[in-house]
């Protein structure tokens, strides 16, 4: 009986093991199926970024907007185009500081987006990439709407390709801005002044602001900490060189001619550069610019202005009033926006225009589709709605865009004055459009360094001018 019992125990044990193995195999199979399904789901979610080369999905990297409404407006444009075209878009927003770094990394790895829009790329990246032959020719996007652009806007994107020894449209204009002057109307009122008292003669204009500071510091309610002029002077901020480029324009110091040639060997140009450096550094030495302006980054003059530490400041966008748009009392009644005065020789000021641009890389995997999207985006009605979402921080690059009454509302003096500056006054782009070597002049902050050499190292304006000229000539030689 014991032998019989052992026999059946062995059978049962063997059967149990087989059963366990069988069901374990089934369980394993089911687990693999579940994992595979989950993996397929995850793959579908990430295929936009991981399968660019095998799909028609367009990758767009776009500068994150100053306001959330800007980003939402672009998302809607993308969604509308996806519906009408049947194509898909992977849209990524990056900050102003991160996007250039991300782009630099992508250029080294070859993992490029199909379309890029970066506010800083205009003068730090695009002219160099066009020169190196790394951008797609976008003439087909420009051609149908070419007559709608102003000459200055077209000039900004008509760039030189050193590889092909010719110029072409290697970028598409999206919006433009120039440099404005913002001031506190209520601070002027404290010293019995208003906008009608501000003169248009160059020297008298700046003397006016000096007197405002002196009266605010010595009036019935003295403010010993206030400065009249929030002018950036550091060798780190793009606001510094943008403002100084406008000062050079005021003094008619043409650094690069229309053929792209340096003019720095001309004594009259050297003298005008020295005059410009002497003018701006004298304002600081006289105590009308905050001491820490030598260290300011791009946001610092905005902060000092909004905190009422300065009476007025130049700024290359309308971001200062835009930041106060929700406070109607501040926006409409306390903050003001001004044009620059006439040039020192009495001529009307010509404004330097910054044109923000979108590009398609030559090695982009979906070039044709990216250009189709750009052609959709630059339709005047589409682009205008996008710009209006930014509450007028930037302005149209096309003539039909200006016809929208949004830009001509006289009750909004910030936008109305900016519109006048960009549509009724002479304008020109930065010098990089004439010669891409000038991008390096801006990147190296040559003018900010010259200002700091005068103020920190007691160099004369003449010697600082010669140092700046020597470095600029070196840069241009390297680009030949």
Stretch-by-stretch model annotation:
Residues 1-8, 12, 16, 23-132, ...:
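Conserved N-terminal structural module of periplasmic/extracytoplasmic solute-binding proteins
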Residues 52, 88-89, 189, 282, ...:
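Conserved C-terminal helix/tail region of periplasmic/extracytoplasmic solute-binding proteins
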Residues 93-102, 200-204, 292-306:
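Short helix-initiation/N-cap motifs at beta->coil->alpha
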Residues 120-180, 221-225, 240-243, 251, ...:
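Hinge/lid segment of periplasmic solute-binding proteins
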Residues 137-152, 198, 221, 231-235, ...:
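Short, solvent-exposed loop/beta-turn-alpha elements that line the ligand-binding surface or hinge
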Residues 160-174, 179, 204-263, 310:
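Extracytoplasmic/periplasmic solute-binding protein
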Residues 208-213, 259-294, 336, 340:
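Glycine-centered hinge/linker elements that transmit conformational signals in sensory
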Residues 318-331, 343-446:
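C-terminal lobe and pocket-closing loops
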């Amino acid at each position: 009986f014991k032998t019989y019992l052992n026999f059946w125990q062995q059978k049962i044990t063997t059967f149990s093991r087989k059963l366990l193995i069988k069901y374990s195999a089934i369980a394993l199979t089911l687990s693999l199926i579940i994992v595979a399904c989950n993996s397929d789901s995850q793959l579908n979610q990430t295929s936009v970024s991981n399968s660019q080369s095998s799909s028609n999905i367009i990758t767009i990297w776009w500068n994150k907007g100053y306001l959330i409404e800007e980003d939402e407006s672009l998302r809607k444009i993308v969604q509308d185009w996806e519906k009408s075209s049947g194509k898909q878009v992977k849209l990524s927003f990056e900050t102003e500081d991160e996007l250039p770094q991300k782009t630099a990394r992508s250029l080294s790895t070859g993992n490029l987006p199909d379309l890029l829009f970066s506010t800083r790329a205009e003068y730090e990246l695009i002219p160099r990439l066009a020169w190196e032959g790394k951008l797609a020719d976008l003439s087909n996007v420009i051609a149908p709407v070419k007559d709608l652009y102003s000459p200055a806007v077209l000039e900004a994107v008509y760039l030189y390709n050193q590889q092909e020894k010719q110029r072409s449209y290697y970028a598409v204009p999206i919006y433009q801005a120039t440099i404005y002057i913002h001031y506190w109307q209520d601070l002027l009122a404290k010293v019995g002044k208003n906008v009608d008292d501000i003169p248009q003669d160059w020297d008298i204009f700046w003397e006016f602001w000096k007197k405002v500071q002196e009266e605010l510091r010595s009036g019935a309610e003295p403010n010993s900490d206030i400065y009249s002029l929030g002018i950036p002077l550091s060798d780190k901020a793009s606001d510094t060189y943008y403002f100084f480029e406008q000062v050079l324009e005021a003094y008619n110091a043409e650094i690069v001619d229309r053929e792209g040639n340096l003019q720095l060997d001309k004594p009259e140009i050297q003298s005008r550069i020295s005059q410009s450096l002497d003018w701006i550094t004298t304002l600081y030495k006289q105590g009308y610019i905050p001491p820490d302006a030598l260290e300011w980054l791009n946001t610092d003059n905005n902060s000092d202005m909004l905190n009422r530490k300065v009476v007025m400041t130049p700024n290359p966008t309308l971001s200062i009033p835009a930041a106060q748009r929700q406070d109607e009392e501040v926006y409409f009644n306390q903050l003001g926006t001004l044009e620059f005065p006439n040039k020192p020789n009495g001529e009307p000021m010509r404004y330097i225009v910054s044109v923000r641009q979108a590009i398609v890389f030559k090695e982009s995997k979906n070039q044709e589709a990216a250009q189709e999207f750009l052609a959709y985006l630059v339709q005047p009605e589409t682009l205008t709605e996008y710009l209006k979402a930014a509450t007028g921080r930037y302005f149209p690059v096309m003539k039909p865009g200006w016809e929208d009454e949004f830009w001509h509302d006289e009750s909004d003096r910030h936008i109305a004055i900016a519109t006048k500056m960009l549509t009724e006054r002479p304008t020109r782009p930065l010098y990089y459009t004439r010669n891409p070597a000038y991008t390096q002049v801006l990147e190296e902050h040559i003018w900010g360094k010259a200002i700091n050499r005068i103020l920190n190292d007691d160099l004369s304006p003449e010697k600082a001018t010669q140092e700046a000229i020597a470095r600029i000539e070196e840069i241009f030689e390297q680009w030949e």
